Amino acid sequence: MTDIGESESDISTDVSALPMLSHSVSYTSIQKPPFVVSVIGSGNWGTTVAKIIAENTRENPLLFEQKVRMWVYEEEFEGSNLSDIINTEHVNKKYLPGIKLPDNLVAVPDLLEAVQYSNILIFNIPHQHLEKILSQLRGNIDPRARAISCLKGLRVNLDGVELLPDIIQDALGIHCGVLAGANLAQEVAEQRFSETTVGYPLPADYKPGDVDHTVLYTLFHRPYFHVHVIEDIAGISCAGALKNIIAISVGFVEGLEWGDNAKAAMLRRGLLEMIKFGRKFFPGCLVSSFTEESAGVADLFTTCTGGRNFKLAKIMAQTGKSAHEVEKEILNGQSAQGLITAKEIHELIKNKGCEEEFPLFETTYQILFHGVRIGILPYMLENKWSISKPNYSS
């Protein structure tokens, strides 16, 4: 039996069977292969995805330019610039230590240099920095480029919900898809088997030879990292954001030692509310994206068995401390994304007058921010909770 980390020449894509792909390598009308790929972001997950891409571009030279540029936010580590360490030692010692990177992966500290001539842009940065990055890129990339967002989350305000790929698309005028799944970066970097989902509907201006599902499959698929390409960006994006609220509810149950049956109840109810939310605010999203894809139920399961949101809620239940207190103690100044998402979702559904349609989301918010007892969760599962009920915090 072949180890999944060893040679995969027997299963790599046969590029000779693919159409010759022409594309833009400058801002002129000249079209010629292969695709040039740049990764924007070099953190734990960003470096892992860049490693995968560099492995695949090296094996598919007719389809991709072999050199992959990865934008690195320059910082000093152990007396040297991080980009220099990556380029000389082929290891990201700060964010992905111990993992050897392909020598065709090049760290570039200048953002515009990193994306110059690129046809495929991979966004993999903390979403709070997205606007700043987009403002620097605007007007400086090929307008015919395509993009994939590896960011998980939504932009929520009182009026509605925006998908992060749509924000990228609107800012840069380029078509953007999404990649998400049950993908713990360290496990993927160590070449342990996992799956992921790519959401990418073909753009309205698609022509033969453009980036399509085959190209994206070839770019991301590895023997240890299996890829399924679908068209539902909204379903993948909703699942990636809402899972963190559900992980908090499961963490509450774990902290109170209610057992596996109770955790299963939270997962079941959370999955249903996740689907309902997606269908309500993005009617075109597919139920199958939540129930069949790695970006849906698989990522939900992984998030609800560990991670910072689960751990925060577990400690809250065990100690009686507030979310703010626990966050300060265990996250070293960082934020648990589930807290932010829970508040944003509450404000949205309250503004839309549909709190009672999402009792798990609403109750989790009330526990986090208004001192409601965690013990109300079983009552919530009977769908009797609403903000007009008596005060359950005493």
From Swiss-Prot:
PANTHER family: GLYCEROL-3-PHOSPHATE DEHYDROGENASE, GLYCEROL-3-PHOSPHATE DEHYDROGENASE [NAD(+)]-RELATED. GO terms for molecular function: glycerol-3-phosphate dehydrogenase (NAD+) activity; NAD binding; protein homodimerization activity. Keywords: NAD, Oxidoreductase. This is Glycerol-3-phosphate dehydrogenase [NAD(+)] 2. Belongs to the NAD-dependent glycerol-3-phosphate dehydrogenase family. It holds the Pfam family NAD_Gly3P_dh_C. Transmembrane segments: none annotated. It is an enzyme of class 1 (oxidoreductase). Substrate binds at K152, R308, N309. The keyword NAD applies. Its EC number is 1.1.1.8. It comes from the Eukaryota. It catalyses: sn-glycerol 3-phosphate + NAD(+) = dihydroxyacetone phosphate + NADH + H(+). Gene3D superfamilies: N-(1-d-carboxylethyl)-l-norvaline Dehydrogenase, domain 2 (1.10.1040.10), NAD(P)-binding Rossmann-like Domain (3.40.50.720). GO terms for cellular component: cytosol; nucleus.
